[in-house]
Amino acid sequence: MSKQWQAAARVFEFLMESQHWPAADLRDYQLQQLEQLLRHARAQVPYYNKSLAPVFRGDGSINFGRWHELPILKREDLAQNPDAFNAASVPQNHGKVSEFRTSGSTGHPVVARHTWPAGQCRKALP
């Protein structure tokens, strides 16, 4: 089994286990994961370095009470400045970065980059 499929199997096992967690434990875990994602995005992605500023306090902690102040990302934002959305680096265990393109049928074709796990999640969600 490839490393990618081993990682997918671990995610599946985790989901099967965590579906039975108490709501408070699940919420705590989700907030912890969201904090890691926000810190990575702010540190590595030019667009998010600026746009996430309202939720970060001076000490680096995150104020989720200001979440409503974050700008809504629009498709044209991605189309007009795709390089601003590219992470300078991704965690090594996330694998190779690949590019995908949309058809542009909406009038705003988008070119984006993702790792294999992110691409699989994108395919799995409606």
What is the role of each PLM region?
Residues 1-101, 107-126:
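Nucleotide 5′-phosphate-binding alpha/beta core
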